[in-house]
């Protein structure tokens, strides 16, 4: 449902109208939005990932789950391909590596904050400003081509 709401805000058909960096920033902001408004979704995803990685599930058992990710995966790949055309962010590293170093890092940070698994955290504290700073570092990395 959450991804469907995002689809309404930024339809996949609009990929050619929006610079890749703006799509990327939208994705980063979406994770922060999940932290603010849908912490349970981030927590569920974390618990699900833990379960899947430790329960000994086979690939066939995860087919429905993998199918549900198709829309998001397609969006990220189209965003990356668009960046190759408009040069609004780095594409000098392979797509899979780019995703791990950027999108997955942001998702992991938001998940850890949602779970309260951060050093020195106060319960019920709002850490949006810190997540925005992390987002800023990631965006600077993808724009500046710095390691």
What annotation goes with each model-predicted range?
Residues 6-7, 76:
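N-terminal alpha-helical segment
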Residues 24, 62-65, 69, 99, ...:
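Hydrophobic packing residues in well-ordered alpha-helices of helical domains and bundles
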Residues 1-5:
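Short, basic, alpha-helical segments at the C-terminal edge of helix-turn-helix-like DNA-binding modules
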Residues 30-34, 74, 78-86, 100-147:
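C-terminal peripheral helix-coil segments that are non-catalytic and often amphipathic
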Residues 11-41, 95-102, 131:
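Hydrophobic alpha-helical connector segments
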Residues 13-14, 49-56, 113-117:
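Secondary-structure edge/capping motif, primarily at the C-terminal ends of alpha-helices
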Residues 33-75, 96-97:
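Short secondary-structure transition hinges
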């Amino acid at each position: 449902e959450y991804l469907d709401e995002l689809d309404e805000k930024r339809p996949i058909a609009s990929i050619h109208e929006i610079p890749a960096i703006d799509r990327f920033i939208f994705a980063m902001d979406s994770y922060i939005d999940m932290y603010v408004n849908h912490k349970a979704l981030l927590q569920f995803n974390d618990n699900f990932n833990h379960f899947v990685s430790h329960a000994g599930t086979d690939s066939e058992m995860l087919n429905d789950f993998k199918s549900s990710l198709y829309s998001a995966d397609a969006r990220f790949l189209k965003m990356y391909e668009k960046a190759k055309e408009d040069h609004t962010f780095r594409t000098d590293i392979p797509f899979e590596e780019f995703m791990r170093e950027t999108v997955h890092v942001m998702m992991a940070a938001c998940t850890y904050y949602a779970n309260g698994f951060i050093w020195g955290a106060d319960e019920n504290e709002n850490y949006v400003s810190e997540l925005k700073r992390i987002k800023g570092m990631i965006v600077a990395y993808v724009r500046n081509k710095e390691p």
